[in-house]
Amino acid sequence: MTIAVGKFTKDENDLFDIMDDWLRRDRFVFVGWSGLLLFPCAYFAVGGWFTGTTFVTSWYTHGLASSYLEGCNFLTAAVSTPANSLAHSLLLLWGPEAQGDFTRWCQLGGLWTFVALHGAFGLIGFMLRQFELARSVQLRPYNAIAFSGPIAVFVSVFLIYPLGQSGWFFAPSFGVAAIFRFILFFQGFHNWTLNPFHMMGVAGVLGAALLCAIHGATVENTLFEDGDGANTFRAFNPTQAEETYSMVTANRFWSQIFGVAFSNKRWLHFFMLFVPVTGLWMSALGVVGLALNLRAYDFVSQEIRAAEDPEFETFYTKNILLNEGIRAWMAAQDQPHENLIFPEEVLPRGNAL
């Protein structure tokens, strides 16, 4: 019996090998298998957004002007969510709502579902791109893992939250002022700023900004392998083997400032990864809770005392009154399909009034 030792080689490359060779070859812009998902989805999402903000009105869904064609600017234009009556319909162009009529599809808000779904899969494609490239050059996949934070936030805010509510109508529209309106809505109807998951998200994002600033400044402060270039960006040879800054000096400096300091580069950089990604994930979990109408902290004893005693008021009770005002003033204009009318006497007023 003969035993052949070695690698099995095929006489001919099959279709998979041909595609793999073309997709993953070295070129200026890497394509890869992930590019089959990333590039079409990103193209359609961005293209749909530009089309909507340029030409498409929100008159039929929100009673608003939302395009450059109607006189909006970059801050006020948006691709608006479908009407509440359409609930969670995917609003496919060939579906029963639009029936292949592109104009009707745009009027119904079909561009929003188009942008949201292609955007979500585009972000997932970008994360897979980082996985694929990391594997190709034999790096660990922490970049892709970190990018799961923005994906979690996007999916929770634009997809999971409206799925928990009555329809896509209550998701954010894709525009600057539209996002601001959504933030006010979250505060008024969910008291979002008093939600512990929002607090963790703020701590993560702002803490990461602080860490980034401190880290960048510290490295700049402790450079020692300086060259003779005209400025910092030309002074270093990118292929030099040795490091260009002193971790020991940085450790000594922050030990004197705070009494404690990072002494290990791996722990330092993992912490800089952990803080923002955890913050984003906590925010995403909080929004999933809001989709189910879970409440934030309620300090009922303060509300009861404020209702009984006109002279007792806290920042919490003032915020509760502000939230009531947001709901009363916002609901009527934000949900015109409900035909809400609030008499002047039921609109909330603070104790000072």
UniProtKB/Swiss-Prot annotation:
It comes from the Eukaryota. Keywords: Acetylation, Chlorophyll, Chloroplast, Chromophore, Electron transport, Iron, Magnesium, Membrane, Metal-binding, Oxidoreductase, Phosphoprotein, Photosynthesis, Photosystem II, Plastid, Thylakoid, Transmembrane, Transmembrane helix, Transport. Pheophytin a binds at residues 130, 143. InterPro entries: D1/D2, Photo_II_D1/D2_sf, Photo_RC_L/M, Photo_RC_L/M_CS, PSII_PsbD/D2. The keyword Isomerase does not apply. GO terms for molecular function: chlorophyll binding; electron transporter, transferring electrons within the cyclic electron transport pathway of photosynthesis activity; iron ion binding; oxygen evolving activity. GO terms for cellular component: chloroplast thylakoid membrane; photosystem II. The chain crosses the membrane at residues 41-61, 125-141, 153-166, 208-228, 279-295. Chlorophyll a ChlzD2 binds at residue 118. It is an enzyme of class 1 (oxidoreductase). Chlorophyll a PD2 binds at residue 198. It is found in: Plastid, Chloroplast thylakoid membrane. 2 of the reaction center chlorophylls (ChlD1 and ChlD2) are entirely coordinated by water. Photosystem II (PSII) is a light-driven water:plastoquinone oxidoreductase that uses light energy to abstract electrons from H(2)O, generating O(2) and a proton gradient subsequently used for ATP formation. It consists of a core antenna complex that captures photons, and an electron transfer chain that converts photonic excitation into a charge separation. The D1/D2 (PsbA/PsbD) reaction center heterodimer binds P680, the primary electron donor of PSII as well as several subsequent electron acceptors. D2 is needed for assembly of a stable PSII complex. Belongs to the reaction center PufL/M/PsbA/D family. PANTHER family: PHOTOSYSTEM II D2 PROTEIN, PHOTOSYSTEM II PROTEIN D1. PSII is composed of 1 copy each of membrane proteins PsbA, PsbB, PsbC, PsbD, PsbE, PsbF, PsbH, PsbI, PsbJ, PsbK, PsbL, PsbM, PsbT, PsbX, PsbY, PsbZ, Psb30/Ycf12, at least 3 peripheral proteins of the oxygen-evolving complex and a large number of cofactors. It forms dimeric complexes. NCBIfam families: psbD (TIGR01152). This is Photosystem II D2 protein. It comes from Cucumis sativus.
